[in-house]
Every structure is written in structure tokens, then in C-alpha cells.
């Protein structure tokens, strides 16, 4: 009886610690587990890696010709975006991607890092950590570093982004410099999404000041079309 009680108590402590130690959101772990159940990444795959902006895209549908060609080789366009993810969270799930040595990887993140009150220095350092790991563990993967997209504070939906519009341009300038240093392709999406005469996301292509409507994804699709093939 004492042994049973001891085991029960140990289990309860473990569960409690697990709940306390949970590093990311429930959605993060849900998506992570979904990825685990999918077919593994292979060398023909094109991976789009990022946060909610990436998760919200129907990438294989945007590029049906490329998807069909990849399917013939056993590959696919793979959406590896997770709502709320950060550079740190992305780093922690690279083990689901890099062993497959994908053909191409298009990477975008930063908005959630900004909302967590991280400095531009820290954000860029964490993104650099992700990029260097990709280059080290999958050196033949063609990496495309996409700039942060603008957001629009006037919607007043995301309080943690208030007063931080200026950070986007600051981070992007450093990311462009980093891309040159690492000899990877930088895709500057930022100006394509701006409201004319401002540094804010065009309100016509967003419903909440951060995430994109269909029209926004069409702009994105056109901007990366030459890389997703």
C-alpha cells in the first residue's frame, strides 16, 4: 500500500511539474504532434516555416504546379507554421525537419518575439541561431529568409504590439545584413504590405491588424512564386 501511494504521489508530482514547465502553448504542442504523425520531411520537399502568418497560408494550393511536380518525386510543399510561435519555438522543432534535408526552406518569424518584449538584438540573435542550425545540419537546403511583415496598431487588437511598429524595420534591416553574412537569400516582403505613406500593414488586407486576408496571401504568393518551384 505504501509503495502504491509513493508511486501515485510521484506521478502526481510529475504531472504538476509538467504543467508548470510547459514552455509553449497548447496549440504549439497540438501542431507538433500533428507533424509527428505526418510523413517525414524528404529531400524533395519545400518547407514554409514560421508562425501564424505561415500557418494561415494554403501553400500547396497556391502553387498547384509545383505541388504536382514534387508529388511525382515523392515530395510536397509543407506548411510548418504554428500560431504564436517564436524563433525559440521554431528552433526547438527543427528536429522534425532537418533530418529530411528538404530541398528548400522559406522562413519567417518575429511578430511574436516582438510581442514578448524582446529587443531587436535578441530577436535577431535567436533567428540567427535557427539559420545557423539549418545550415549546419542540412547544408544543401536552399534557405530563404523572409522579412517580417508590418502590423497595424490602429486595430487595437494586440496590446503587446502597441508602440512597436518601428521595431519591424529595425529587425528587418538586421535580418538583411545577416542574410548577406550567411550567404542566404533575403526576401523583403515588408514594403509590399504597407499602407501607402505609412509603416503600417495595409488595412485593406487584414482583419485584425496582424493576420492576412485572402488578398494579403495573394501578394505573398506572387512575391515568392519564383522561389517556390
Model-derived features: where do they sit?
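Hydrophobic h-region of N-terminal signal peptides that target proteins for export
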Residues: 10-18
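Alpha-helical cap/lid subdomain in secreted, periplasmic
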Residues: 67, 72-76, 92-229
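Single-residue recognition of alpha-helix boundary sites
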Residues: 13-14, 62, 158, 224
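Serine-esterase "nucleophile elbow" of acetyl-processing enzymes
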Residues: 19-101, 200
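Sec-dependent signal peptide recognition
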Residues: 2-10
